[in-house]
């Protein structure tokens, strides 16, 4: 973080020329008075706040997770659906794998069949690499460890604390650095 500043309209400066660097795997605490810019600083670091002056640089492949004080969750979804968002990449791969397998029941040329078999193999390798065959077990263990509400419960019916646990579960499954 090089020379980061943030001003809210009309002229409230909450961050002024901040320079920070972190060691790999360091645990960082941010303390300060109400309104001093703690949440804004964390949002800048997490990439949520994009309108700031200065430069934010991460090592290649480095990811940051942020659990907001009031997580924004889709009230029409179930606990399971929100938690699955944390593993969106592998969920998408598994979905495509199922679609490819369903296509085997359709009539096709030998060329199409060979392409389908090749794609199935690629997807299977990706699933193996991400340990995707164990996704259901992983989600259940994560939800259980955080004492999330039942997986079929609607988000709109959850308390604030339950919503935060669901959001935390989703965030941890994203495995940010």
Predicted regions and their residues:
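ABC ATP-binding cassette signature C-motif
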Residues: 1-177
């Amino acid at each position: 973080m090089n020379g980061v500043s943030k001003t809210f309209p009309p002229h409230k400066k909450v961050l002024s020329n901040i320079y920070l660097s972190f060691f790999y795997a360091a645990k960082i605490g941010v303390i300060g008075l109400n309104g001093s810019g703690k949440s804004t600083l964390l949002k800048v670091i997490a990439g949520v706040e994009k309108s700031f002056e200065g430069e934010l640089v991460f090592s290649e492949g480095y990811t940051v997770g942020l659990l907001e004080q009031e997580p924004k969750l889709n009230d029409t979804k179930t606990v399971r659906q929100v938690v699955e968002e944390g593993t969106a990449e592998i969920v998408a791969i598994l979905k495509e794998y199922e679609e490819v397998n369903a296509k085997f029941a359709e009539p096709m040329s030998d060329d199409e069949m060979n392409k389908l078999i090749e794609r199935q193999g690629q997807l299977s390798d990706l699933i193996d690499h991400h340990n995707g065959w164990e996704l259901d077990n992983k989600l259940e263990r994560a939800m259980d460890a955080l004492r999330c509400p039942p997986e079929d419960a609607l988000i709109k019916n959850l308390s604030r604390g339950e919503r935060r646990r669901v959001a935390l579960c989703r965030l941890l499954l994203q495995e940010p650095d």
